């Protein structure tokens, strides 16, 4: 006895659909986003007013583009008594690494590199921490003050360094961090990577001189102090410091 045909065989114009095909909603409806991602990526006009009023601008107030960059690449010998470098030294000129006039704003600072020990020092069993301070000098004059002249320490220990009371109105610690290296035969860590990015928005003012030197600053010089905690074993810091700045419209 022959089997009866299925109803779809008797219906004219009905096409068979393979059951092996992937008929998921993603292929039919296209790529869909979740409600959470749609809420996070909503347009600015749908967000509260505080997001529109207090949004950080790309260009600092009172400045104009383009964004310029100045790099400081050097190997530093970091000792227990400390060291200081000026990272707001920008020469006057017309290039992408020069300032146009006396005033400019350092928007951000990018520090990357490593802390490492010498071949003879890394064999000794010790732990050495390198401390860094990003300091703003509001009234620069002459040459940068040494680490011991700016910071007050207990028992000459850099890890307890704080700005002296009579210099607090002039020197302001904006950021600080440290990196640690360990020497020895077994559990040694002879180098440590350094990578920091900060937004500072520091408005620097120069005098009429064109050279980018600390002695030509008149307001808000940026200084980077560094010191190690071990008294007899110094370390080396190979750093690349990039300063991103904008020229002021008051030039």
From Swiss-Prot:
One Gene Ontology term from the biological process aspect of the record: symbiont entry into host cell
Pfam families xref list: Gemini_coat
CC per GO annotation: host cell; host cell nucleus; T=1 icosahedral viral capsid
UniProt-recorded Gene Ontology molecular function terms: DNA binding; structural molecule activity; zinc ion binding
Motif (Nuclear localization signal): 35-49
Segments carrying motif Bipartite nuclear localization signal: 3-20, 195-242
Subcellular location: Virion; Host nucleus
Highest taxon above the source species: Viruses
InterPro entries reported in the protein's UniProt record: Gem_coat_AR1, GV_A/BR1_coat, Viral_coat
Keyword vocabulary terms for this entry: Capsid protein, DNA-binding, Host nucleus, Host-virus interaction, Metal-binding, T=1 icosahedral capsid protein, Viral penetration into host nucleus, Virion, Virus entry into host cell, Zinc, Zinc-finger
Start and end residues, zinc fingers (unnamed): 63-80
The keyword Nucleus appears for this protein: no
UniProt keyword Nucleotidyltransferase present: no
Coarse class of the protein's main subcellular location: virion
Positions occupied by motif Nuclear export signal: 96-117
Assembly notes: Homomultimer. Binds to single-stranded and double-stranded viral DNA. Interacts (via nuclear localization signals) with host importin alpha-1a.
Role noted for this protein: Encapsidates the viral DNA into characteristic twinned ('geminate') particles. Binds the genomic viral ssDNA and shuttles it into and out of the cell nucleus. The CP of bipartite geminiviruses is not required for cell-to-cell or systemic movement.
Protein family membership: Belongs to the geminiviridae capsid protein family.
Name this protein carries in UniProt: Capsid protein
């Amino acid at each position: 006895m022959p089997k009866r045909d299925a109803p779809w065989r008797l219906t004219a114009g009905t096409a068979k659909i393979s059951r092996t095909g992937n008929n998921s909603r993603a292929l039919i409806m296209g790529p869909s986003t979740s409600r959470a991602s749609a809420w996070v990526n909503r347009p600015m006009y749908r967000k509260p007013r505080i997001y529109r009023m207090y949004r950080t601008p790309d260009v600092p107030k009172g400045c104009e583009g383009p964004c310029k960059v100045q790099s400081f690449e050097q190997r530093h010998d970091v000792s227990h008594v400390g060291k200081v470098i000026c990272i707001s030294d920008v020469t006057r000129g017309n290039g992408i690494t020069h300032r146009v006039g006396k005033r400019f704003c350092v928007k951000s600072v990018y520090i990357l590199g490593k802390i490492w020990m010498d071949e003879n020092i890394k064999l000794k069993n010790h732990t050495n921490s390198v401390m860094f301070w990003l300091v703003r000098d509001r009234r620069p004059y002459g040459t940068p003050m040494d680490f011991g002249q700016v910071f007050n320490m207990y028992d000459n220990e850099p890890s307890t360094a704080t700005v002296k009371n009579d210099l607090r109105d002039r020197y302001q610690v904006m950021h600080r961090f440290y990196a640690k290296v360990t020497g020895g035969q077994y559990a040694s860590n002879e180098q440590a990577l350094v990578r920091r990015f900060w937004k500072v928005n520091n408005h620097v003012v120069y005098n009429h001189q064109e050279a980018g030197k600390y002695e030509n600053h008149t307001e808000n010089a940026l200084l980077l102090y560094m010191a190690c905690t071990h008294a007899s074993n110094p370390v080396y810091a190979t750093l690349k410091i990039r300063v991103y700045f904008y020229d002021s419209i008051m030039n």
